[in-house]
């Protein structure tokens, strides 16, 4: 080979190495995502977590952020619940740190365990999506505009996620979320079912076991939910009918209805004229500098936030997720140059879904394919209120019936639900669809009632703890118990561990107290006997002259008291130890459950923990940025 040929070969080899080098460097394994420590974590073993970015579109630098929590126990089979918040453009870290996740913030620095978190019997996967939401990032020019784009993007994410974490792919899979996720979830479910039908997926045995959907206070059917604003506020007494202000709201509602009756808009997700109804209601409630909270009508907020500052945990979440040590712990890419915000206005502005049909049109097909769906509503939410959801269900047709018809003209009953003796809500179900109304709950039901929402989840997933033990929750539908569920009272749950630890400490103190009482009695008896002995010795001394006061021991007085005192002390120690009944402690459960590795055991293991370790993260915060909740604000 001549010089020119050699140079060409060298150049070709250099190009090949340049092309292949990035792939060899950037390919990641599960160990790269392992969360070794979490700043502010509560005492006790760290829950098994993975977090970080997965690139879904190299050409647009599109990266989605995820935070995964492994289940604490497996009741009968492994399950994974994927949680999505709405907006559009609102981060699912809302769900992780304020709703269904295992931790909640006490302040900007400190996390605490949540009793009733959804990770007890299911793996939880929180995803900031679409691109641009929360910790996710990418080219702003390529933010998604339609719901089918969003679903395609999410399926790509799942494909890549399961390649890194293949041991979770066979799990029963559920999608859950709230608010605008009522649009996301049906579209994603449809995309997953269509994917499962592909020949290459079936040939490679990579079918995803989609088992159900859960949507809370979902924005699903604009055609039914926009008109529900007015009857809801009348029903709840927020607006007084017949007033001048009420007439103004009714005029806005009439204009919306006119738009909804136009054929071109019946299949539209976002209708600006209809958005004016909610704004008119908020203006009506404007008193001084306050207005009603659109997410919980029992509360007020600064005007014109009207709920954007709620829940109160928000003031701590943004500073916490912008701390440098937290950013490092969660493996946030350096390419993510802006700090975390709850809702990205640019994402919401882009995703208007002008050519997307509302998700309500997908629900009948999903139900008819045998996919169970649960819709739940908080009674005190205005923005995605239960009146609109119930009207949507009432008019929806699937599987040969309308709404909750069991047969023509016969409707499934609304069943009373009680939880631990208190009225909790209503259940209604037919033909794969379940509806749950939570009494006295807001837009974010798990924020208000984590234990009740977990009970609902366990019922829907079919979790039954009968064969693994635990204190069952007293949850009844029309007075009857269903499968035995445990909400924070499982013997290996974090909350139960704290209770058992307290029991153990109490038992120990009782045992010590009891042994102390016995020792006191022994000392009193010994003192009395000593007094009698001295008295008798002195009487002898008075009758026969001075002798040692320890005549029977054959000891002189020098140093003898110390020796007898020593013997008495040892004897007392033996009696005290003998009187300490160790069975009182043996009756209490072992502290072994306080260690995650020992409490889970092989029976509950899903995958293996990474052995990699990292140095502790450094403290500090990133600069603060403005926060928006998106235009719709349906987070």
Swiss-Prot record:
Membrane keyword on record: yes
Record organism: Paracoccidioides brasiliensis (strain Pb03)
Protein name: Pheromone-processing carboxypeptidase KEX1
Signal peptide boundaries: 1-27
Residues spanning the membrane: 515-535
Annotated Pfam families: Peptidase_S10
Protein encoded by which gene: KEX1
Segments for region (Disordered): 472-500, 579-635
Subcellular location: Golgi apparatus, trans-Golgi network membrane
Keyword Membrane set for record: yes
Protein purpose: Protease with a carboxypeptidase B-like function involved in the C-terminal processing of the lysine and arginine residues from protein precursors. Promotes cell fusion and is involved in the programmed cell death.
